[in-house]
Amino acid sequence: MTTPTPTFDAFSPFHLSWMIHRNLIPFPTTLGMISGAEPEEFTEELRKQLQQWSVIDNTNQLTPDAHDLFRGLYEYDFAYWGVLLLHNEKEPFQIEMDQELIDIGIGRSISDTPRVYWQVSYSNSTITVAMRAGDNLTLNTMPADEGNLYESLARAILTVLNPNGIWPAAQFTTVKIPLEVVEKIPTHDASGKKHDKSSVVKTMKYELAKRGVAFDTSSRFVKLINAEKLADTEVLFMPKNKISTSEFFTIEFVHKVGMVLTRTGTDVEGNPVIVQEGATIGAIAEELRKLKAQ
């Protein structure tokens, strides 16, 4: 049987794999697993398309314009990256499992959460935005506003996370909760099974009241816990030619609330707290600035 010639409507991870395995560009680790090698029967079609799109020339080398575009993936002054988890698109599926594992509480059904891998990098007054979702991969550049660099980077990140601008930043007074309370409340039992949300909330209210947290503050925090989280991503910082740092903040997409930024901080006495606020351009920019300043 003859394998049909594949048709790709746009640049894909297969094209990127073709380039990586011919040493045209380094492997971009932030974009998740790229196919170990493009299917052999696709090779010629991929090469032809890359030439048609002026990514490579007749000698199968990067064109000058393509080199300028792709080097933003790996040659930059600094970058931010993350993985957007689309919880609202989670789909359960069945797997074969030994009875011994089932007996200790591990079920046959697990969930596959769709992921969007992204990276936003900066170099020479240019911001490069890369995104991979399944078999779709996009790479774009935009000029940076040097006078408002971190606001430019925040907007670039939101072109991936909130491309149509339909999600507003959450509108509520900033919430600060003692970190020890959040860490103390178990969300799963010893077997890994999730506790009922109502029992977690009840315990949380008790612990917050015991520590003198204002009722309106604890109420706002509990409301956020109860709300449906449709998607979220950690935002991490990556210095030039170094591995990613461990510090991060989170942007969550909460049903009927909006985009929420969650970070760690300290209260007036220097005690660690969890801070939640609306994920405005200004709030995101400030956290990007802090990550780089570490």
What are these regions (language model features)?
Residues 7, 24, 44, 175-226:
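An exposure/low-complexity boundary signal
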Residues 205-294:
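Extended, charged low-complexity segments
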